Amino acid sequence: MSLLNGPVLEPQDSSKPAKIIIFCHGYGADGNDLIGLANYIQPQLPDAVFLSPNAPEKCGLNPMGYQWFDFQSGDPATIWKGVLNAADTLNNYIDEQLQSYGLSDDNLALIGFSQGTMMSLHVGLRRLNSMRAIVGFSGRLIAPELLKNDLKSKPPIYLIHGDIDPMVPYQETIDAEKKLSELNIDVQAHISPNTQ
């Protein structure tokens, strides 16, 4: 049984879902933070179920929110261990949802924000079967130097970042696009001017 749960928006056409869209929220938020985006996407994907799980850990800086992993220590080994634990949890959740709905990775997309983008990229590029797409807002690649050896699939990726983001510098998205392109991954990045 998955450790993750959160809000769900069922298909608009009340049919059995043919697609799964999973939102991965940012540090200190929860699943409610992103599920509202489903209302804007659903008209184009009426046969999709939208899932927005809470990350697995309570957030150290915001006890009302959640985190995928703790980065406050600044210790790379501790952060990496947290990333790996969160990746296992997210992978298990994805597998459970795919099995529950009788779908495969090619019917799945991940949409992440900030730390959720970090997890979406980390997990999505290391799954044995390629998912339909990854969309990431205001994130970065975690341990990009390890990706070449860990890479198992190459889903198309679209990255968006504001050029005045106060938390994660937009250069992280530019660097991610460069690294992913070097690995022959179909990636596009958009830097939004005058946007956090």
Can you describe what each PLM-predicted range is?
Residues 2-107:
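Serine-hydrolase catalytic machinery in alpha/beta-hydrolase-like enzymes
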Residues 105-106, 152-157, 183-186:
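Short, proline-enriched alpha-helix->beta-strand connector loops that line the catalytic pocket
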Residues 174-196:
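C-terminal catalytic histidine-bearing segment of alpha/beta-hydrolase fold enzymes
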Residues 158-161, 165:
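Short beta-strand/loop motif that positions the catalytic acidic residue
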Residues 54-58, 140, 195:
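Short beta-to-alpha linker loops that shape the active-site pocket of alpha/beta-hydrolase fold enzymes
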